[in-house]
Design a protein with these regions (language model features):
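Glycine- and charge-enriched low-complexity intrinsically disordered segments
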Residues: 137-163
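Electropositive, beta-rich accessory/interaction domains or terminal extensions
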Residues: 1-104, 108-113, 150, 160-178
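Flexible glycine-rich active-site/ligand-binding loops centered on an Asp-His dyad
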Residues: 111-142, 164-178
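Short, structured beta-strand/loop micro-motifs enriched in basic residues and often containing a Trp
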Residues: 82-91, 133-144
Length: 178
């Protein structure tokens, strides 16, 4: 069984603490991040990360269903762009991607860790309550970009369990066997 979801939004911010913008698609650069995004440029709020922590900040995801759930607890609703995550998803539980290989559009990624909420989304959006409403599993996840390619609104997200190489797109089997 292959678990699937869909990309519902793609967002970039050129600098730390600047508003994110919604884009129809973005180019994922292996080992770096999304072209034009603050973390790919090394100017994100947490770009000082080193070693293993650097890999976990290449791209971030948030689940549309968790935004809707969190908004039940806020006075002013948060939109996906307000969360400061790069990709809004629908139809897949993001915590299932931790420790898994998965594809998004043309890319292969590896889910690294949960994306703990901080105060920056509230500070940038001017909307109170992000830290509290998006606590725990609602904050989304971070991932490492293993192969570059395009990510777009409407792209499919698929989980690949190690050992199920026959489901991988051409060329990915060799990558997975490294």
């Amino acid at each position: 069984m292959v678990l699937k979801g869909t990309v519902r939004g793609v967002f970039l911010a050129s600098e730390a603490k600047k508003r994110m913008i919604s884009v129809g698609e973005a180019r994922a650069i292996a080992g770096i991040g999304l072209a034009g995004d603050r973390y790919a440029k090394g100017v994100g709020s947490y770009s000082n990360a080193t070693g293993a922590n650097l890999k976990v900040r290449q791209i971030s995801f948030i689940q549309r269903e968790m935004i809707q759930l969190a908004n039940r607890e806020t006075e002013v609703p948060f939109e996906a762009v307000d969360t400061r995550r790069n990709v809004e998803t629908e139809g897949i539980e993001l915590e299932q991607l931790i420790g898994q290989y998965f594809s998004v559009g043309e890319t292969l990624m590896y889910g690294t860790k949960m994306c703990d909420p901080c105060k920056i989304p509230s500070n940038v959006s001017g909307k109170k309550g992000f830290l509290e409403a998006f606590r725990g599993y609602r904050g989304g996840i971070r991932a490492q970009i293993l192969t570059g390619g395009d990510i777009w609104v409407g792209a499919e997200i698929r989980i690949y369990v190690l050992g199920s190489k026959r489901r991988l797109a051409p060329g990915w089997s060799a990558f997975m066997s490294r």
